[in-house]
Swiss-Prot record:
<feature type="binding site">
    <location>
        <position position="177"/>
    </location>
    <ligand>
        <name>a divalent metal cation</name>
    </ligand>
</feature>
<comment type="similarity">
    <text>Belongs to the aerobic coproporphyrinogen-III oxidase family.</text>
</comment>
<feature type="binding site">
    <location>
        <position position="147"/>
    </location>
    <ligand>
        <name>a divalent metal cation</name>
    </ligand>
</feature>
<comment type="pathway">
    <text>Porphyrin-containing compound metabolism; protoporphyrin-IX biosynthesis; protoporphyrinogen-IX from coproporphyrinogen-III (O2 route): step 1/1.</text>
</comment>
<protein>
    <recommendedName>
        <fullName>Oxygen-dependent coproporphyrinogen-III oxidase</fullName>
        <ecNumber>1.3.3.3</ecNumber>
    </recommendedName>
</protein>
<keyword id="KW-0627">Porphyrin biosynthesis</keyword>
<dbReference type="InterPro" id="IPR018375">
    <property type="entry name" value="Coprogen_oxidase_CS"/>
</dbReference>
<feature type="region of interest" description="Important for dimerization">
    <location>
        <begin position="242"/>
        <end position="277"/>
    </location>
</feature>
<dbReference type="GO" id="GO:0042803">
    <property type="term" value="F:protein homodimerization activity"/>
</dbReference>
<dbReference type="GO" id="GO:0004109">
    <property type="term" value="F:coproporphyrinogen oxidase activity"/>
</dbReference>
<feature type="binding site">
    <location>
        <position position="94"/>
    </location>
    <ligand>
        <name>substrate</name>
    </ligand>
</feature>
<feature type="active site" description="Proton donor">
    <location>
        <position position="108"/>
    </location>
</feature>
<keyword id="KW-0350">Heme biosynthesis</keyword>
<keyword id="KW-0479">Metal-binding</keyword>
<dbReference type="Pfam" id="PF01218">
    <property type="entry name" value="Coprogen_oxidas"/>
</dbReference>
<comment type="subunit">
    <text>Homodimer.</text>
</comment>
<feature type="binding site">
    <location>
        <begin position="260"/>
        <end position="262"/>
    </location>
    <ligand>
        <name>substrate</name>
    </ligand>
</feature>
Amino acid sequence: MSVPDVAVVKAFLIDLQNRICAGLQALDGQATFAADSWTRAEGGGGTSRVLTQGAVFEQAGVNFSHVTGAAMPASATAHRPELAGRSFEAMGVSLVIHPNNPYIPTTHANVRFFIAQKEGADPVWWFGGGFDLTPYYPFEEDVREWHQTSKDICAPFGDEVYPKYKKWCDEYFFLPHRNETRGVGGLFFDDLNQDGFEQSFSFMQAVGNGFLTAYAPIVERRKETEFGERERQFQLYRRGRYVEFNLVYDRGTLFGLQTGGRTESILMSMPPLVRWQYAYTPEAGSPEADLYDNYLKPRDWV
């Protein structure tokens, strides 16, 4: 297995953050990202970049972090107990975008690299990441295009890659207590190292580079769609699912909190406004019911 080049991965991630922020600013056309660099007492640091109250995006956060530690946290060793006691480095770019317009989906993307080392032993490393889409008022053409782009990203790496990571995404972004998916999925991968460093890194780069290719056309198509208070209230209600998933199930959030990560950056994914409603049930045949009936369960889109 080829030797990991940590510096090359870090350089790519910093550049990716810059390029995604530039692309999102261009899509918004009004607001700009404020950068907030931070250091972590236990080792490492990062830069959080947040755009708020834009013409298109109510809030968009794009975070780069590179943290180091002397021992692995419980969230990372739960399914890899052999890694307990190793020092680690974790780096990645993570983003969440909450648009103003309920007809534009919320989206999340993340690419990351993890390496754990111990004197006298080979390093253990892997890549992870993916992206997923959470519409409020979905359009089938948007969802199909999103998944076609996902499939195109995976194609050079083998025909089995897209179905595998699409299925993993559907399974990961699932709320058992609601019995529904968080959205319409995309790609999710983790523990990627079996093809060696170069090939694994290439796939992670393809996913990171492909995110805006998948998302930008949907934003452009829907950003002028008119909406009213009904759509806004439903958007705020459905954002509650995002909060529930991230605080209860998301491994990245739990890892960050357990490793003493920067709380503001970890919770950057939270929507700026959200609401809950007791025992909400959409009206039969309504656009809101369409989301529940046709989109919040795994489907083959391409």
